[in-house]
Amino acid sequence: MTLTPEERDALKQQVVACLRDEPEVRRIVLFGSFLGSASPRDVDVAVFQESEEGYLSLALKYRRLLRPVANRIPVDVIPLRATGATGAFLHEIEQGEVVYVR
């Protein structure tokens, strides 16, 4: 799927609109092929959050909230702790685009 800059911006705004009202969400970062390709295969969304909920329940919750976006392009969502997140994969996420900060 080829996206125009306007379509890409609209999808970014839609991701934020779907997740910003969740009280635990602190930061949303988009990364991966969505940023670097004219024809991305999906949208990778890292949600930095402060919640005691487990990874699976948060991932399912965010996937449900992001269904309007997923109807246009596949979505991969990764909930991460706002503090203490570490690892090599985090470096790739940090190279992404921050689209929301609370």
Model-predicted segments: where are they?
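Short, well-ordered beta-strand segments
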Residues: 44-46
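Catalytic core of pol beta-like nucleotidyltransferases
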Residues: 1-29, 35-40, 49-102
